[in-house]
């Protein structure tokens, strides 16, 4: 950024301004003794300032994470046979129930016809048993046949009824196997590379994965964090300091090249157990993937609001001189400039979040320090500074901006 490139110049200008502010009284006395008219004093230069007020700001942590599909399904064959045709395009989106492979179905078609023939035979046997029983019933009443013969006819009918039910079940089983010869998608999602080609022989019960389908909208992102930080996060949630409008913690995603994913995600849950070997807890968030930008397995940086800082101040980056001790220049009540040591917590777009060193209503100098230092003016004229369009549009996605931050008075 530009303010880093001119850091040495800013430091020199700040030192000059401080020295002039400290020596202005002595120089003014010397000028009076030399007979210099008061009207010859240099006019007060205009400096750009921002009047700061305390706010409640969520400090964001950046954690490593990995993207994971919402659902993943491996496609396998449930019946054996030779693959005759692949019915999908690799890498395409498929819907649940869509045909993916066709296995040679001739054997299963024959099995279904055989089961139907068995049903016809069983039904014919049942019809004969019904007719025999109908003839035997009046005969046994007249003692024309023995009771044993009648009981045998009853048993034959029941056996024929069971044979019909078995044949019906065989038809159903043969139909299931025939349907399974056409392998369909178990879930909707993007299907990857086919692991088999036409002509491959599959055996019944084979565990070979034919292809994998991944459901990628929304996507999961898994993050690990120390147990102590997660406990702190839970306290913040319990106090209501980090809840978003929908009652969930918002998370952002940043890629390796530094770009930030435009969609915000939401924290779903924290694993209830701590990894004994690392002392870490796994957190899971969900994020929309309507444009299919996110890919399963991709490593990302997760931006997550972790701590709500009360009485924090949002200060433009160019107003802060970074060093062993971070400082800003303040316009005091007498109209002069004075340095103030501050504590910078973290970056927020083109601003710094300052957690100590400032007070409500302080006028922090953003522009004009160099001019004031060169002119040797004892006083300056503060003017509210407005950022340029580029600076106003720069706050980082996934991090709360100053305009979104809640004033500390409202947070309480």
From Swiss-Prot:
One of its GO terms (molecular function) is transmembrane transporter activity. It is found in: Cell inner membrane. One of its GO terms (biological process) is response to antibiotic. Residues 377-412 are annotated as: Disordered. Pfam families: CusB_dom_1, HlyD_D23. Coiled coil: none annotated. Residues 1-24 form the signal peptide. PROSITE patterns: PROKAR_LIPOPROTEIN (PS51257). A lipid is attached at residue 25 (S-diacylglycerol cysteine). It comes from the Bacteria. A lipid is attached at residue 25 (N-palmitoyl cysteine). It is a lipid-anchor. Keywords: Cell inner membrane, Cell membrane, Lipoprotein, Membrane, Palmitate, Signal. The keyword Lipoprotein applies. GO terms for cellular component: plasma membrane. Residues 388-403 have a biased composition (Polar residues). PANTHER family: ACRA/E-RELATED COMPONENT OF DRUG EFFLUX TRANSPORTER, MULTIDRUG EFFLUX PUMP SUBUNIT ACRA-RELATED. Cell membrane lipoprotein, involved in cell membrane permeability to hydrophobic compounds such as antibiotics, dyes and detergents. Belongs to the membrane fusion protein (MFP) (TC 8.A.1) family. NCBIfam families: RND_mfp (TIGR01730). This is Membrane fusion protein MtrC.
């Amino acid at each position: 950024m530009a303010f880093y490139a001119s850091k040495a110049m800013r430091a020199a200008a700040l030192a000059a301004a401080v020295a002039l502010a400290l020596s202005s009284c002595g120089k003014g006395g010397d000028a009076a003794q030399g007979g210099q008219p008061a009207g010859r004093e240099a006019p007060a230069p205009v400096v750009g300032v921002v009047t700061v007020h305390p706010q409640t700001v969520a400090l964001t942590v950046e954690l490593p994470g990995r993207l994971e599909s919402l659902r993943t399904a491996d496609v396998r064959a449930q019946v054996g046979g030779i693959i005759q045709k692949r019915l999908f395009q690799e890498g395409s989106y498929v819907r649940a129930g869509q045909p993916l492979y066709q296995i040679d179905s001739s054997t299963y078609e024959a099995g279904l016809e055989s089961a139907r023939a068995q049903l016809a035979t069983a039904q014919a046997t049942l019809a004969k048993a019904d007719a025999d029983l109908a003839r035997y019933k009046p005969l046994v009443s007249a003692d024309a046949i023995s009771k044993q013969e009648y009981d045998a006819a009853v048993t034959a009918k029941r056996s024929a009824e069971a044979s019909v039910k078995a044949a019906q079940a065989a038809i159903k089983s043969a139909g299931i196997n025939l349907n399974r010869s056409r392998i369909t998608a178990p879930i909707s999602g993007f299907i990857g590379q086919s692991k088999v080609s036409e002509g491959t022989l599959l055996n019944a019960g084979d565990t070979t994965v034919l292809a994998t389908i991944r459901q990628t909208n929304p996507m999961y992102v898994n993050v690990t964090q120390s147990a102590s930080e997660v406990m702190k996060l839970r306290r913040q949630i319990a106090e209501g300091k980090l809840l978003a409008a929908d009652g969930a913690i918002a998370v952002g995603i940043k890629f390796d090249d530094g770009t930030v994913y435009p969609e915000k995600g939401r924290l779903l849950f924290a694993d209830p157990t701590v990894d004994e070997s690392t002392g870490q807890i796994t957190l899971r968030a969900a994020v929309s993937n309507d444009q299919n930008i996110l890919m399963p397995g991709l490593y990302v940086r997760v931006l997550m609001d972790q701590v709500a800082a009360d009485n924090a101040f949002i200060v433009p980056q160019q107003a802060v001189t970074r060093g062993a001790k971070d400082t800003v220049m303040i316009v005091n009540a007498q109209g002069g400039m004075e340095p103030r040591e501050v504590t910078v917590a973290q970056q927020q777009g083109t601003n710094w979040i300052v957690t100590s060193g400032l007070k409500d209503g302080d006028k922090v100098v953003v522009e004009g320090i160099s001019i004031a230092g060169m002119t040797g003016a004892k006083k300056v004229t503060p003017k509210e500074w407005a950022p340029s369009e580029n600076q106003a549009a720069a706050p980082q996605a996934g991090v709360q901006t100053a305009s979104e931050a809640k004033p500390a008075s409202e947070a309480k």
